[in-house]
Regions:
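Leucine-rich, highly hydrophobic segment in Treponema pallidum outer-membrane-associated proteins
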Residues: 11-12, 147, 154-281, 422-486
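Single conserved position on a long alpha-helix in the C-terminal lobe of the eukaryotic protein kinase
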Residues: 27-28, 70-177, 321-426, 443, ...
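C-terminal motif of bacterial Sec signal peptides marking the signal peptidase cleavage site
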Residues: 5-8
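A short, Trp-centered hydrophobic/proline-enriched beta-strand micro-motif
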Residues: 23-35, 86, 276-281, 323
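Short, solvent-exposed loop/turn elements at domain surfaces
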Residues: 35-41, 197-200, 287-290
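Surface-exposed, low-hydrophobicity interaction/linker segments
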Residues: 39-82, 102, 296-323, 363-366
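Extended non-catalytic domains of envelope/secretory-pathway proteins
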Residues: 257-342, 350-356
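N-terminal mature-domain "stem" immediately C-terminal to a signal peptide or N-terminal signal-anchor/transmembrane
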Residues: 12-59
Length: 486
């Protein structure tokens, strides 16, 4: 019986992979059975159950995508021996999910009740549409997809049917994809970078935005083949691994060899601990300025009125180490509004000409009507009613804008954060505040191809539950409107 169960599980997962088109831009595989076991999310009868703390978070954030998805998954009767697959197809749907269910009729009843809509037979499959979301059930497999743009029900149903009936070449035929998805982790993801190149090329809005920020084309135009990410829950948190897949002599690796500098955590001496997010990349400014994308970005800034005295070109040339940014949500700021001008922010860069850069910035501020006021050894200015602290510490030029006085410690005194950035030329750190306590995520690349990271929490509790509670609080959405298709 155990052997039969193993073969059955393997068979259904193979079938699901055969439904995912080979030209998908990305695929995520979730080991449902492992996540349920580690999260203790099943009762004695094997039914999916959630602890009260998770239910409370989902209730308070019921419009968040993960909350909605988990509410549905708990009720529809998923096959817990099968994986869940999410993928980004090339056409029609912007993203999609494949889920094996125990009883298709029961699953349909749950979806109809939750959506207020009714299934109908279109293109010989059971189809239900709720706003921009399509549900298709065929032979105990549930397809959920969000339309890329508003389309006729018949086209949506026919496209989903093509996936479910394995009408296309699939990822199952590509060993480079399945090798990554089959690693023994709770979550595996494979991102086809070249597929995103095509998506950007076919999107007028993305193309226009890249013209405004040419530095981003360093990544969007790279010849990386793929990026893989792997996550595994452990007793006290979760571990991550990431890999860049590319040819040894690819232009992207040559670019990194020329522009990356040695990892250095000294910038943390000027990043206040009130910052919730930190990103750092160590670069050689002289080589960086030789790139067309960087020159174009610097020229855009240099052509702004009154900025010639700052000499951005020499600023970039002088960088020899980390460029870092820290962010935290200001009072009254919606975290989903990234462009909000009231975020607290800290910018730092290691420079061979730090003192001269500070002098130029002070002179520029004076020209703009900002007097030079010194407080605790830092230059203090005001921007939109918020204090801005600026200075040079150990060759690190920094500017810190806060909605409060700078009376706090800095991240350099935190060993776990310091160890991450001292070993990784490219690093990321996040601090997430919850009612139970704070949770942390740090991640970095120590070389051109291999990255790793950890998720951990300061409060006791199951890390799977903690992680799900955080996801359930992200990106609350209003009811779908036609504008959300575009």
């Amino acid at each position: 019986m155990l052997m039969l169960s193993m073969f059955s599980c393997t068979d259904i997962n193979k079938q699901l992979e055969e439904m995912i088109p080979a030209d998908s831009r990305g695929v995520v595989r979730i080991d449902v059975k492992s996540v349920i076991e580690k999260g203790q999310l099943a009762d004695e009868d094997g039914n999916v159950v959630f602890p009260q703390s998770l239910k409370d978070v989902m209730s308070k954030n019921e419009s968040a995508p993960v909350s909605e998805a988990m509410t549905l998954l708990r009720k529809i009767g998923i096959d817990t021996d099968a994986n869940i697959y999410c993928f980004v197809p090339k056409n029609t749907f912007s993203y999609a999910t494949l889920i094996a269910v125990n009883d298709a009729d029961e699953a349909k009843k749950v979806i109809e009740k939750q959506s207020g809509q009714k299934f109908q037979t279109i293109e010989k499959v059971d189809f239900l549409r709720n706003g921009a979301i399509s549900y298709v059930i065929d032979d105990d497999i549930l397809f959920i997809g969000k339309e890329a743009k508003e389309d006729a029900d018949s086209k949506l149903a026919l496209t989903a049917k093509g996936y479910l009936h394995k009408s296309n070449a699939s990822i199952a035929e590509d060993a480079s994809i399945t090798e990554s998805l089959h690693k023994e982790n709770d979550v595996n993801a494979y991102i086809n970078v070249s597929g995103f190149h095509n998506m950007i090329a076919n999107s007028e809005s993305l193309t226009e935005n890249l013209k405004k920020f040419p530095i981003l084309t360093l990544f969007t135009d790279s010849d990386i083949k793929a990026f893989t990410l792997h996550m595994n829950f452990e007793k006290e948190g979760a571990k991550f691994e990431a890999y860049v897949k590319a040819d040894d002599n690819c232009d992207y690796f040559k670019l990194l060899d020329a522009t990356m500098a040695k990892a250095d955590a000294s910038f943390l001496k000027v990043i206040p601990i009130s910052m919730n997010y930190i990103f750092s990349m160590s670069v050689n400014g002289e080589n960086l300025m030789k790139l067309d994308q960087i020159r174009k970005s610097v020229n855009l800034i240099s052509n702004l009125p009154s900025t010639d005295m700052l000499d951005f070109r020499s600023m970039v040339n002088s960088i020899d180490g980390p460029i870092a940014i820290g962010l935290s949500v200001g009072n009254g700021v919606n975290i989903s509004s990234v462009a909000n001008d009231n975020w607290n922010i800290a910018i730092a860069a290691k420079s061979k000409d730090a003192a001269a850069i500070v002098e130029r910035i002070v002179a520029f501020a004076a020209k703009m009507g900002q007097p030079d006021y010194i407080k605790d050894g830092r230059h203090l200015f005001t921007y939109q009613g918020m204090p801005v602290y600026m200075g040079n510490q150990d060759s690190i030029v920094y500017a810190i804008r806060l909605d409060h006085e700078l009376e706090e410690d800095f991240y350099y005194d935190m060993p776990d954060v310091r160890e991450r950035f001292v070993s990784c030329p490219l690093g990321v750190y996040a601090k997430i505040s919850e009612p139970q306590g704070e949770s942390y995520f740090n991640f970095g690349f120590k070389n051109k191809t291999d990255g790793d990271g950890v998720f951990y929490s300061m409060h006791e509790g199951n890390p799977v539950i903690t992680f799900l509670e955080i996801l359930c609080q992200l990106n609350k959405t209003e009811q779908t409107t036609q504008q959300q298709y575009y």
